[in-house]
Design a protein with these regions (language model features):
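Positively charged, solvent-exposed patches that mediate nucleic-acid binding
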Residues: 1-113
Length: 113
């Protein structure tokens, strides 16, 4: 299992918000931008509107796992920021997965398998 490379700095997130393309579902928003490397990098955010720290961390764990499961099907060389929304922590995993795959198809980052 490969390690997920994280976006760590505020400037990286801001660049993605301003110059990346956004794709939205009822459960989360995904920002995507080419990064010029041969790896994908991930950033996950969950604002205080989602709930207390326990709920925010649960939402982030679910999104991280969703990304991990779909990584083998994704093209390389992109930065992703996934912004959790209120229903992320309570939605069915199958619904999250189908929405995430739909957004990846829209962003044209899924490999042709």
């Amino acid at each position: 299992m490969d390690k997920i490379i994280s976006l760590k700095y505020n400037s990286q997130f801001k660049k993605l918000y301003s110059k990346g393309e956004s794709y939205v579902s009822p459960f989360f928003a995904v920002y995507v931008k080419r990064n010029g490397y041969r790896i994908n990098r991930l950033g996950i955010t969950a604002g205080k509107k989602i709930g207390n720290a326990v709920t925010r961390n649960r939402a982030k764990r679910r999104l991280r796992e969703l990304y991990r499961l779909n990584t083998p099907y994704m093209k390389q060389g992109f930065d992703f920021v996934i912004v959790a929304r209120f229903r992320t922590a309570t939605a069915a995993a199958s619904k999250l997965d189908s929405d995430f795959r739909r957004l990846l198809k829209e962003a044209e980052v899924l490999r042709d398998v």
